[in-house]
UniProtKB/Swiss-Prot annotation:
The encoding gene: Saysd1
GO biological process: protein quality control for misfolded or incompletely synthesized proteins; rescue of stalled ribosome
Entry's Gene Ontology molecular function annotations: UFM1-modified protein reader activity
Organism annotation: Mus musculus (Mouse)
Localization, UniProt: Endoplasmic reticulum membrane; Cytoplasmic vesicle membrane
PANTHER family linked: SAYSVFN DOMAIN-CONTAINING PROTEIN 1 (PTHR13527:SF0)
Gene Ontology cellular component annotations, sorted alphabetically: cytoplasmic vesicle membrane; endoplasmic reticulum; endoplasmic reticulum membrane
Comp. bias regions, Low complexity: 22-43, 60-75
Keywords per UniProt: Cytoplasmic vesicle, Endoplasmic reticulum, Membrane
Domain notes: The middle helical (MH) region recognizes and binds ufmylated ribosomes.
Region (Disordered): 1-43, 60-80
Name assigned to this protein: SAYSvFN domain-containing protein 1
Phenotype reported upon loss of the gene: No visible phenotype; mice are fertile, with no differences in sperm morphology or motility, although the cauda epididymis contains slightly less sperm.
Length: 188
């Protein structure tokens, strides 16, 4: 935070040096207090700072515009990224789902008219089962799986087999350390 404040002050100083010649060509101001904010205006200043300095320069405009927050700390800088609210994303997914169901109903009605309604219904049920069994999106960062919810740390549970032990039990793989499987050694 202190680094950003130092960068802002440095940019403001550089901008004030650039802005000083342009302010002298404007109308002559009577007091030094009014000249200081106009000279300190950086060219890259946007948003609340520009509006504030315009109001200071023209008091008539300041009275016509509604009051805005006085402190700079109340507003976010424009360069920071603000994530979209999750309700917007949720409503988008809801709208897509609604449109899919509506399309399915329209196509079902069309195929019923063409006397292929049952075939369309059965095939579409396979599709909906496929869509329902796969996740709508990949697992999010930090999201817990169903296994890790009941077994935090994913520790081995007493009495369960590992994949290697299960393969050995099913005799799909020879036990570790031996080159041939016991079932193969009994055949000549």
């Amino acid at each position: 935070m202190e680094q950003r404040l130092a960068e802002f002050r440095e940019a403001r100083k550089r901008a004030s040096l650039v802005a000083q010649p342009s302010t002298s060509s404007q109308s002559v101001q009577t007091s030094g207090a009014k000249a200081e904010p106009a000279a300190a205006t950086p060219k890259t200043a946007t948003g609340w700072l520009t509006r504030f300095l315009k109001r200071k320069a023209n008091p008539a405009i300041a009275q016509a515009q509604p009051n805005q927050p006085q402190e700079a700390g109340q507003q976010l800088p424009e360069s920071t990224a603000v994530p979209l609210p999750s309700s917007c994303r949720q409503s988008f997914l809801t709208n897509i789902t609604f449109l899919k169901v509506l399309l399915w109903l329209v196509l079902l009605g069309l195929f019923v008219e063409l006397e292929f309604g049952l075939a369309y219904f059965v095939l579409s049920m396979f599709y909906w089962m496929y869509v329902g069994t796969r996740g709508p999106e990949e697992k999010k960062e930090g999201e817990k799986s169903a296994y890790s919810v009941f077994n935090p740390g994913c520790e081995a549970i007493q009495g369960t087999l590992t994949a290697e032990q299960l393969e050995q039990e099913l005799q799909l793989r020879p036990p570790q350390g031996s080159r041939t499987s016991p079932s193969c050694s009994s055949y000549p």
